[in-house]
Amino acid sequence: MSQQGTIYRVAGPVVTAVGLNARMYDVVKVGNEGLMGEVIEIDNDKAIIQVYEDTSGVRPGEPVENTGMPLSVELGPGLLTSIYDGIQRPLEVLKEKMGNFITRGVSAPGLSRTKKWKFVPVVKAGDKVKGGIVIGTVQETKTIVHKIMVPPNVGETTIKDIKEGEFTVEDVIGHLENGTELKLMHKWPVRVPRPYVEKLRPDIPLITGQRVLDGLFPIAKGGTAAIPGPFGSGKTVTQQQLAKWSDAEIVVYIGCGERGNEMTEVLAEFPHLTDPKTGNPLMDRTVLIANTSNMPVAAREASCYTGITIAEYYRDMGYGVSLMADSTSRWAEAMREISSRLEEMPGEEGYPAYLAARLSEFYERAGRVITPIGKEGSVTVIGAVSPAGGDISEPVTQNTLRIVKVFWALDAKLAQRRHFPSINWLNSYSLYQDSLKDWYDKNISPEWNQLKAESMELLQRESELQEIVQLVGSDALPEDQQLTIEIARMIREIFLQQNAYHEVDTYCSLDKQLKMLKSIMQFGAYARTALASGVPMSKILNLNSKNDLAKVKFEANYDAYLTKVNDDMKKEFKSLEAA
């Protein structure tokens, strides 16, 4: 058996080679054009390969060459601001080489080999180090300091020598006593999770600036969430909002089998967006992986693993990373196609039996951890799921729900009513509520959890009353129940609805969320007192302060505005009761 074999059979993205000395998950070059592939099954002397490029024109008898290496990514300065495909080929570099259409078999290194980076060591000769220890820093962008680490698979040893200066990622910057050369970059296999010291309890929320998420269904840093929903319900816009505004320091956005137009929107928008915390371009802390639906299906799986490996790398530096995978359903469809080409026994709806194992393998790499340098870092994974026809009982959604702890259920009916984000507050849930309670009590207000519980109760009551309203109309209800419906409507329209394209309303701080909810509940309390003292419901509905309250979401100076609205509200209710 040699490092070179020949093609025996071609079936779409799956190629069978004979006479190849290969191990599982070795990367191979397939055919005369050297298409990149990965060994996924070995049967006696046959190696079954999934090819990450289009196999049109490949025929039996062509050579297959084994690289002897697993599918790996290059980790080092230059990742941020980059746009990659699923196997870490830099699309901008390939465009300069090839034009708008990339020909097959073309490759380019993930990190630039010519750009020089200013390296400042933080260790000296004679210092003891081991895998994951920071040896120096590079100012990668204006926002992010890149920490250069000893590769994680290096045991405990001593620094022999280390240099300061400007280097490319391939230049040797020092040596260890065990003979290891130190460079600004190292490679890591994408299927192997990077090691950490300890996993921490998820008790710090990831602040997203989206009221329905922060207010009702929060996610913790290092948590996992799923956004299932039918077409046109707002999955991609919700993911993009999270990528833009969540308080993670690094964002990895994976377009996994998404429409080309949606990826174009991201690629066109992100470079012009400003990071609200630093005032620098948002791209300075973002890695984009674009793998559109017309690209070969096998690369979809690779794009998810590539993305999470890059996320873990920045986590190891002590950063909070949020990873958006849009959409994991397309990855599952690719798995189904390759599984059928391999003639494996199909599971439910034709998906392979190992669907749940692959999904959990991916989501379980999320977490808030202590890194080898003793710092806290986190990877928060938010995966969109696109069930056919919006049917969330299908296998991908169900298997995802068993793994993730936050479920943001997008609703087509809400989207049709132009209620965005169209997250159904009755179907969604967050299992991080209890672990985050203390954080909200200490850092926001002891009232936060109480207000949230009251608003959820009102929304539940409204749902029950709506069934009666549809039969007999709202006028047939007692006035206190009419008021319940009205306050719930205010919560829905003022608090839960949010305009992603409005410069003020696109992001809402926790302080503003608290004050908005407080004012709505205060209106409800005044209204109940007024009803009890005989004020008719029609007069309460016509108050000016109620209409003014609806405008607060578009006010940048919300504090002064809400103070005025609350004062007006108090006066109006007093004059109603006096009359």
Curated annotation (Swiss-Prot):
PANTHER family: H(+)-TRANSPORTING TWO-SECTOR ATPASE, V-TYPE PROTON ATPASE CATALYTIC SUBUNIT A. It catalyses: ATP + H2O + 4 H(+)(in) = ADP + phosphate + 5 H(+)(out). InterPro entries: ATP-synt_VA_C, ATP-synth_a_Xtn, ATP_synth_asu-like_sf, ATP_synth_asu_arc, ATPase_a/bsu_AS, ATPase_F1/V1/A1_a/bsu_N, ATPase_F1/V1/A1_a/bsu_N_sf, ATPase_F1/V1/A1_a/bsu_nucl-bd. Coiled coil: none annotated. It comes from Methanocella arvoryzae (strain DSM 22066 / NBRC 105507 / MRE50). GO terms for molecular function: ATP binding; proton-transporting ATP synthase activity, rotational mechanism; proton-transporting ATPase activity, rotational mechanism. HAMAP family: ATP_synth_A_arch. This is A-type ATP synthase subunit A. Component of the A-type ATP synthase that produces ATP from ADP in the presence of a proton gradient across the membrane. The A chain is the catalytic subunit. ATP binds at residues 229-236. Transmembrane segments: none annotated. The keyword Membrane applies. It is found in: Cell membrane. It is an enzyme of class 7 (translocase). Its EC number is 7.1.2.2. GO terms for biological process: proton motive force-driven plasma membrane ATP synthesis. One of its GO terms (cellular component) is proton-transporting two-sector ATPase complex, catalytic domain. It is a peripheral membrane protein. Has multiple subunits with at least A(3), B(3), C, D, E, F, H, I and proteolipid K(x). Keywords: ATP synthesis, ATP-binding, Cell membrane, Hydrogen ion transport, Ion transport, Membrane, Nucleotide-binding, Translocase, Transport.
